């Protein structure tokens, strides 16, 4: 940075070093080479912003738990292999109707065709089982979830978002339907777009600020116009180099890299130009000629610029030790960019000064003054204690705000409300919960097939346990696809449904009970008939007995008649034979009649035989009729008993039916209560449910093809990208573990991905990264300070004051942004601001301490005064330029960039105006010679008094007017 003091009363003599001599002699070729190099890297590859879009890197590392969870879910479901989620939201002022649904179906069918950008579509609205879960309660909005190619933040993911937006833009929604593309992936894509759009504005504003500051400092248009090309060319070379490396895949980029690299290149280039011009003008002011002034300038500034640049480059390279991809990829491009800026400051800027010096364009226009800073130095050495206490008190303003730091993770709040993604979020917020567009995915994978009633019981148990976690709004699973338990899936309801058939058959049963009364009446009629029959059978029995007796008498009479006729037949047989022998008997009437008489006599014999058979039958009938008569009384008694029993049974069943009806009413009420309450208690899914076509379709959404993995979609009640939302992830994990204890799924693998899970990995990774990167950067800065100052205590003071300045700056940023503006400080700010402030802040302190060391020969206190007088103006100017340059980033559309710039700007202002001006000098004054330990420094002057007075007269500020 600012050079050490040299004896400038005499023009340096002897051979000049080869590097400055070569630069002075070849100034024009060097300028042309830098111009050519800048033009080449600018036209050989696209602009840095375009390369940043194509080489954008993911936010979270591939080995993060959330990344592994999303990849695993995509693998077991054969759906996707990234963590990029986007939402397409449909909104209307009226409830969505059939036209909206047809448009939605057509849009989804069109999205399915783009398989290079869209890996999977979770289409809830089309499936009747899950449709209600994708539509808002007022029916005026619906959404579909897309899994895109590429991880969030990567170029492919951003390209996929643009592809989806193009499809949506080319669709023709019905009148009154508005369609938005939102979600985490769209949010990252819009961040990059916002950062790139703001880059030109930031750059233009930065150069405007620098121009104004240079004009105020030098009061010379010529000097300002000569410094600006140094910065412009150096900036172009730096950006072009990183763009070239990024284009060929040598470094990763992000919108943060592009913005911070540009700001650092402008600020550092301007600072180095101020140091060079200031040293050149100082040499010219004390009477050296232009050539000697050039060599004095280079000899006094080259080592400081090189040390400063290497410190910043080394500190920024420490970001490569981070695990988070966002930080890890920032290290190499920022470090390489700073090396290019340093190279330009050590070659290009001196070449321009050499060319301009030949025409006297950089000669000082007026006498330089140091009285103001000399008075500051005098006050510091006179009252070091009170000044140090006051400085610490000022630092406490920021330090006391640090405990209230609440990092912000939701990038939505760091973009303007009018960005496409925020319009989509706003539309979703009007109809859904605040976290519906940022869901979590819980995956439970086991070695058990869960496509059975037992598996469903465990799945619903997990869903209930997760739902009971504080802050969880709803859980979607196969047992609750719409976020509430399946309808009619409780044991009480199924019991009530079992009795429903009885309720339906109750009227029929009552009709049959009425039939039983009819049957009883009919049985009574039958009984009466049988009693009459008994009386008739009794009479029939008597008649039968008489008929049997008469038949036996007739048989006896007939037998006697046959015997007498037989006697007659025997007597007239010869005569009888004549009638049978006569051939013409039938022609003779008397013969024929007589023959018929004899045939009649033969019939008496037949009649006798038949009467004998009839007599046998009558005897049997006479025997059976009493038996039949004996059967009728028991039958009548039995029928009377049956009738009595039927009437009793009818009365009993009627009472039971009334009781069953009452019981069924209670069961139905209980089932309806469980169904209405949707509590999920007593959940049970019968086996026949698995044959339902809609349920089978739902299983494809929530269960893997082999049935051994189940996923849950979890929505938070509040912002998932918040400290509370992030803390909720471990609670969800613990609830899941508790739910599967002592179940067939015990020991199953649990994965959680999504917004809060991703930011949990980021938060945990940030803690590690800040620790590692911070320690590495502090150690690097301390080593550089130790090598340059060769004093352990001085190096510790430099590092300590820088750390104090860093804490104060961050606290002030928290105070301004979080408490005044009302926007939490983004989680990336700590790491990005720490590195820059460590490097730049230590450089300013190093400059001051180096000047202390040069002037210590005049005595400790006198040396401090002279160092303050000699460096105060130039360091203040450089610090203000750097601070305002970084603060110019506050105009960015991306408020994260604005917070980075304001945090670094506040730190540099505090470091320049308080730490370097009061705190470090007061500490040096208080410690005295111990400040230089282990070096031996005398408190008294060690140079002749004349030389001391001459040195006092030589002290002039390097650039600024007092």
Curated annotation (Swiss-Prot):
Keywords: Cell membrane, Membrane, Transmembrane, Transmembrane helix, Transport. One of its GO terms (cellular component) is extracellular region. GO terms for biological process: symbiont-mediated evasion of host immune response. The chain crosses the membrane at residues 25-45, 201-223, 225-247, 256-276, 302-322, 335-355, 383-403, 768-788, 796-816, 820-840, 867-887, 895-915. The keyword Transmembrane applies. Signal peptide: none annotated. InterPro entries: MMPL_dom (IPR004869), MmpL_fam (IPR004707), Mycobact_MmpL (IPR050545). It is a multi-pass membrane protein. SUPFAM superfamilies: Multidrug efflux transporter AcrB transmembrane domain (SSF82866). It is found in: Cell membrane. It comes from the Bacteria. Belongs to the resistance-nodulation-cell division (RND) (TC 2.A.6) family. MmpL subfamily. This is Probable transport protein MmpL9. It comes from Mycobacterium tuberculosis (strain ATCC 25618 / H37Rv). The gene is mmpL9.
């Amino acid at each position: 940075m600012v050079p050490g003091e040299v004896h400038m009363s005499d023009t340096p003599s002897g051979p000049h070093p080869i590097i400055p001599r070569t630069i002075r002699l070849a100034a024009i070729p060097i300028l042309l080479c830098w111009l050519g190099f800048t033009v080449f890297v600018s036209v050989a590859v696209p602009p840095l912003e375009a390369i940043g879009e194509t080489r954008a890197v993911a936010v979270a590392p591939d080995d993060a738990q959330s990344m592994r969870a999303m990849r695993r879910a995509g693998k077991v479901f054969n759906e996707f292999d990234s963590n990029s989620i986007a939402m397409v939201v449909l909104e209307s002022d009226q409830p969505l109707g059939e036209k909206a649904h047809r448009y939605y179906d057509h849009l989804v069918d069109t999205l399915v065709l783009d398989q290079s950008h869209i890996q999977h579509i979770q289409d809830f609205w089309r499936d009747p089982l899950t449709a209600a879960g994708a539509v808002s309660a007022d029916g005026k909005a619906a959404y579909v979830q897309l899994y895109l190619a590429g991880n969030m933040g990567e170029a492919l993911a951003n390209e996929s978002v643009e592809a989806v937006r193009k499809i949506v833009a080319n669709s023709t929604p019905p009148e009154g339907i508005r369609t938005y593309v939102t979600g985490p992936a769209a949010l990252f894509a819009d961040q990059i777009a916002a950062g790139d759009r703001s880059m030109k504005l930031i750059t233009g504003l930065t150069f405007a600020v620098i121009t104004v500051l240079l004009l105020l400092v030098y009061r010379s248009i010529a000097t300002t116009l000569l410094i600006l090309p140094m910065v412009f060319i150096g900036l172009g070379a730096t950006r072009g180099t990183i763009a070239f490396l990024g284009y060929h895949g040598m470094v990763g980029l992000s919108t943060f890299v592009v913005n911070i690299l540009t700001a650092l290149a402008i600020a550092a280039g301007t600072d180095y130009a101020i140091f060079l011009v200031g040293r050149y003008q100082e040499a010219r002011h004390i009477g050296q000629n232009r050539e000697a002034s050039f060599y004095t300038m280079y000899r006094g500034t080259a080592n400081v610029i090189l040390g400063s640049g290497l410190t910043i480059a080394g500190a920024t390279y420490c970001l490569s030790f981070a695990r988070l991809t966002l930080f890890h990829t920032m290290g190499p491009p920022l470090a390489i960019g700073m090396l290019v800026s340093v190279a330009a400051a050590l070659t290009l800027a001196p070449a321009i000064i050499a060319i301009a010096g030949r025409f006297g364009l950089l000669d000082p226009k007026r006498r330089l003054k140091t009285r103001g800073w000399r008075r500051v130095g005098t006050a510091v050495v006179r009252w070091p204690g009170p000044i140090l206490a006051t400085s610490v008190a000022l630092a406490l303003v920021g330090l006391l705000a640090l405990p209230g730091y609440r990092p912000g993770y939701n990038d939505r709040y760091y973009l303007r409300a009018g960005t496409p993604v925020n319009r989509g979020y706003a539309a979703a917020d009007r109809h859904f919960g605040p976290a519906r567009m940022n869901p979590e995915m819980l995956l439970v994978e086991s070695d058990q097939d869960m496509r059975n009633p037992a598996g469903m019981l465990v799945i619903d148990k997990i869903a209930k346990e997760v739902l009971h976690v504080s802050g969880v709004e709803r859980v979607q699973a196969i047992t609750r696809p719409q976020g509430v338990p399946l309808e009619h899936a409780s044991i009480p309801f199924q019991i009530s449904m079992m009795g429903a058939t009885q309720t339906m058959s109750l009227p029929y049963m009552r009709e049959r009970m009425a039939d039983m009364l009819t049957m009883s009446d009919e049985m009574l009629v039958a009984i009466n008939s049988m009693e009459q029959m008994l009386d008739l059978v009794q009479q029939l029995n008597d008649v039968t007995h008489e008929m049997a007796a008469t038949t036996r008498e007739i048989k006896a009479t007939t037998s006697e008649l046959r015997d007498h006729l037989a006697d007659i037949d025997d007597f007239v047989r010869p005569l009888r034979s004549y009638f049978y022998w006569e051939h013409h008997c039938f022609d003779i009437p008397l013969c024929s009649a007589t023959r018929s008489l004899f045939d009649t006599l033969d019939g008496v014999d037949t009649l006798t035989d038949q009467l004998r058979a009839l007599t046998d039958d009558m005897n049997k009938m006479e025997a059976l009729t009493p038996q039949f008569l004996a059967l009728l009384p028991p039958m009548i008694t039995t029928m009377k008993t049956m009738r009595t029993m039927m009437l009793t049974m009818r009365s009993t069943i009627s009472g039971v039916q009334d009781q069953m009806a009452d019981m069924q009413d209670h069961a139905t009420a209980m089932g309806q209560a469980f169904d209405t309450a949707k509590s999920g208690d007593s959940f049970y899914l019968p086996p026949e449910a698995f044959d339902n076509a809609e349920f089978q379709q739902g299983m494809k959404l929530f269960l893997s093809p082999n049935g051994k993995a189940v996923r849950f979609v979890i929505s938070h009640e509040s912002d998932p990208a918040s400290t509370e939302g992030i803390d909720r992830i471990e609670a969800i994990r613990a609830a899941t573990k508790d739910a599967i204890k002592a179940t067939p799924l015990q020991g199953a693998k649990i994965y959680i991905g999504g917004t809060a899970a991703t930011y949990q990995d980021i938060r945990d990774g940030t803690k590690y990264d800040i620790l590692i990167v911070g320690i590495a950067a502090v150690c690097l800065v301390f080593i550089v300070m130790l090598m340059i100052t060769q004093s352990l205590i001085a190096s510790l003071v430099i590092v300590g004051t820088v750390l104090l300045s860093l804490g104060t700056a961050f606290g002030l940023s928290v105070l301004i942004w979080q408490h005044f503006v009302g926007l939490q400080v983004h989680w990336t700010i700590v790491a990005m601001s720490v590195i820059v402030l460590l490097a730049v802040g230590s450089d300013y302190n190093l400059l001051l301490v180096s000047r202390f060391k040069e002037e210590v020969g005049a005595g400790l206190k006198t040396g401090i005064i002279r160092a303050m007088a000699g460096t105060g103006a130039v360091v203040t100017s450089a610090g203000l330029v750097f601070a305002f340059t970084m603060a110019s980033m506050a105009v960015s559309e991306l408020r994260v960039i604005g917070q980075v710039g304001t945090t670094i700007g506040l730190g540099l202002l505090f470091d320049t105006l308080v730490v370097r001006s009061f705190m470090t000098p007061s500490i040096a004054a208080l410690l005295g010679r111990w400040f230089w330990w282990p070096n031996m420094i005398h408190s008294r002057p060690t140079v002749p008094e004349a030389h001391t007075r001459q040195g006092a007269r030589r002290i002039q500020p390097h650039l600024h007017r007092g």
